[in-house]
């Protein structure tokens, strides 16, 4: 299948980025030069550059042009296991900060309620936290918990930064994950704002659950949204390797 010229421009620039023949801060060819080189209209050249900008590879400076964005070294993240995200990042030596964004009661959602093994009449709360490394937003964590199991969650939820730490305060000590599901999506306008990313930066969505090992109680249903350009994902099942 023939590749259209806009895609060819994108691919050629991406090859240079991957091969590191272009360096952060280096200026890209102008729309006019690209249009001339590939024998296309300026609009086609502009669309190619706009796509690269939306994907987070380049940035524009009004009146000066477009430049290659500096990228941070990807963070290696083990997606499963019994260690909290906070502990994983601290153990790896990263400067992690967490902002509690909300604690709200949700309407009935069959996926959430089934995962929590909650009754139809149960009150379920969603606690959202924004994760930042070196003050750069990298993930949104959403924890869904049943008030029947945590009667004070409406009062405590707005202050929670680590769910595992909260569970330990209540006497739960050892945790394991439920079935984990991975999917890919693109950010909504709200997620773009929170994660400081463009509309075409793919997001990795991890849906899982947390179970107390001793009692086998389902403590929470978890939905985590990661910026795909900030992590390398370790999916090895044996975390003690």
Where are these regions (language model features)?
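Extreme N-terminal segment that seeds HTH/winged-HTH DNA-binding domains in transcriptional regulators
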Residues: 1-42
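Alpha-helix C-terminal capping/helix-coil junction sites
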Residues: 17-18, 53, 168
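Short, hydrophobic-biased segments on the C-terminal half of alpha helices
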Residues: 49-50
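Beta-hairpin "wing" of winged helix-turn-helix
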Residues: 54-63, 69
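A generic "binding-loop/recognition-motif" signal
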Residues: 64, 85, 159, 163
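Conserved segment of winged-helix/HTH DNA-binding domains
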Residues: 71-99, 231-236, 240-241
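C-terminal all-alpha effector/ligand-binding and dimerization domain
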Residues: 97-241
């Amino acid at each position: 299948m023939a590749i259209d010229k806009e895609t060819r421009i994108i691919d050629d620039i991406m090859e240079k980025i991957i091969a590191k023949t272009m360096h952060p801060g280096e200026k890209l060819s102008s729309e006019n030069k690209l249009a001339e080189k590939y024998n296309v209209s300026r609009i086609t050249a502009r669309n190619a550059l706009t796509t690269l900008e939306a994907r987070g590879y380049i940035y524009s400076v009004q009146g000066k042009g477009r430049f290659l964005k500096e990228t941070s070294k990807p963070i290696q993240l083990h997606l499963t296991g019994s260690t909290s995200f906070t502990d994983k990042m601290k153990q790896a030596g990263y400067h992690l900060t967490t902002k509690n964004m909300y604690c709200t009661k949700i309407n009935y959602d069959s996926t959430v309620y089934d995962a929590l093994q909650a009754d139809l009449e149960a009150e379920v709360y969603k606690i959202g936290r924004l994760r930042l490394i070196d003050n750069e937003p990298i993930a949104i964590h959403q924890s869904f918990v049943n008030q029947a199991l945590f009667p004070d969650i409406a009062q405590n939820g707005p202050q929670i930064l680590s769910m595992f730490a909260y569970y330990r305060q209540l006497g739960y000590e050892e945790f394991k994950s439920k079935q984990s599901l991975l999917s890919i999506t693109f950010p909504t306008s709200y997620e773009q704002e929170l994660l400081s990313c463009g509309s075409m930066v793919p997001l990795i969505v991890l849906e899982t659950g947390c179970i107390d090992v001793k009692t086998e109680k389902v403590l929470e249903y978890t939905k985590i949204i990661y910026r795909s350009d900030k992590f390398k994902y370790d999916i090895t099942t044996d975390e003690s390797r």
